[in-house]
Regions:
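Secondary-structure boundary motif
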Residues: 29-33, 84-87
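Hydrophobic residues in alpha-helical membrane-spanning segments
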Residues: 17, 33, 59-60
């Protein structure tokens, strides 16, 4: 079984970011070995990620180093992609 690595590009006070974070936490409850890392949009690493991937504002979700979703994130599509990357649907 493959354990996906999730990175959430977020920002303080960002309501859509909180929604995506909640969804990822629920998914983590279902898949305890899921690795979720938060990166602050305004940090040096966040700025590098956003420039490299043309992310103009948070949130953005990366799956195994590749952008999965950004901006207005479709939760269902995100969940399906994470489950599929894990080898379960």
């Amino acid at each position: 079984m493959i354990v996906p690595n999730i990175m959430l590009l977020t920002s303080y006070g960002c309501t859509p970011c909180l929604r995506v974070k909640r969804i990822l936490n629920e998914l983590k409850a279902e898949m305890p070995d899921l690795c979720v890392q938060e990166v602050e949009f305004k940090s040096a690493s966040g700025a590098t990620l956003s420039l490299k991937n043309n992310v103009l504002y948070p949130p953005a979700v990366f799956l195994d180093g590749k952008i999965l979703a950004k901006g207005k994130i479709d939760a269902e599509k995100m969940i399906v992609a994470i489950r599929e990357s894990r080898g379960s649907s």
